[in-house]
Amino acid sequence: MMKSFRISKGKINGARLTAFFFFDIVNRVRLTLGVECMIQKYLIKVGIFLLNCSYSVFKLLPTNSNKVLFLSRQSNKPSIDFRMIVSQLEEDRDVKIVIMTKRIEKNMKDVLFKNVPLFLRQMYHLATSKVCIVDGYNITVSVLNHKKCLIIFQIWHSLGAAKKFGYSALKTPYQQMIAKELKMHKNYSYIIAPSMEIKKYFKQCFGYKEDHFLLGTLPRIEYLKTHHRVNKEKIYRKYPQFRNKKIVLYAPTFRTQGTDRTQEIIDAFQNSKYLFILKVHPNTKTKYHISNCVYDCREFSTLQLLSVADYVITDYSGTSLEAASLKKPVYIYGYDFEDYQKDPGMNYDLKKEFGKYFFEDAHALYECIAHEKYDKQVVIDYFNKYVVQTQDVTQKLVDLIIEKGLEDEETDYRLFEKTS
């Protein structure tokens, strides 16, 4: 027989009021983030806690004052910037170099747990290195509590900053939550910026104040000039049909399926007098319909292909500055410019920077290349605005790394956590 309980009216109203406020708060959280998001948040917290527990053991190991660690998740092999810095460092100093590069997809939902062996190796080297150099967001660099003696340099993998990233690109509560929990771009000692103009945007994107920034240029600018002839001959040996031809290089940034209009520009140049090189982003899965005059040249990098390009078409990537450093005619194919201004957003207006060489229509762009002479002052002014150092850039960058990192005599080698 079911027992009956008598509750006073006042208690009923109080209970209802408490329940109302409780469920109102829960519903607000669910509407803002969602239950799955809340679970993910606590899984991230648990993952980071476990990583730091493991890392505390590695931090008992001594620091090698001549050890420099390079970390990247942009590619499975070292970038030209990393390789040139390593070469110059080894020439200037007696250093121990460790390079760890592995491409990690941006699905943060399970990234903490699927890459544990990699993270453990990174933790060992972070705990025993004096200097760490990264070219993008790296989980172990940002979420771990490091020794005070570890100096971390961020040399962002893109020469420019046309499109927003990092903190300036966060649009939703979910993105903000993920960025906060994964401590996005935390723990950097110094961030390298190619100009005062770019530094202004980097401060917003990385979330750092003035004293964390150093002026310096990526070594790729030097590489483009010193290896121009060598790269051209390599490509000509592989593609002898490129000799004495007018070549158009198209190197767009990544697009998801459904937003990609690359096929339109391929069609515009098919059966023309130009050879067309299509160099899409590594993450692109779209298949294109191409003819015999279109090449993908997948065995060569965009930097190498710039050596044979007579015309360069790109959009919001750093390729525009890389091509401009060689005074190549640069055209912006910004068919989704209005959408990009909304998400992720633009730091500076490429439509204003390039004027009549900015296009949203592929056939109009083709007509411009085919019939109009290019005003190279446009790319000269553009490059000089966003990149200030052009001579001995690798040596100057390595000098900064040595001065601010390896020769930091005031470092305390005891086990202190690095302050933000």
Q: Where do the protein language model's features map onto the residues?
A:
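Nucleotide-activated donor-binding/catalytic signature segment of Leloir-type glycosyltransferases, i.e.
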Residues: 284-300
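Membrane-proximal basic amphipathic "stem/tether" segments
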Residues: 6-14, 19-75, 414-420
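C-terminal amphipathic helix plus adjacent low-complexity
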Residues: 39, 361-420
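A donor-sugar binding/catalytic signature common to diverse glycosyltransferases
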Residues: 132-139, 143-156, 300-344
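Short acidic-hydrophobic, aromatic-tinged amphipathic segments that line or gate anion-handling sites
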Residues: 113-118, 294-298, 354-365
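Active-site and donor-binding regions of nucleotide-sugar-utilizing enzymes
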Residues: 69-226
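Catalytic binding pocket for nucleotide-activated donors in carbohydrate/polymer assembly enzymes
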Residues: 318-386
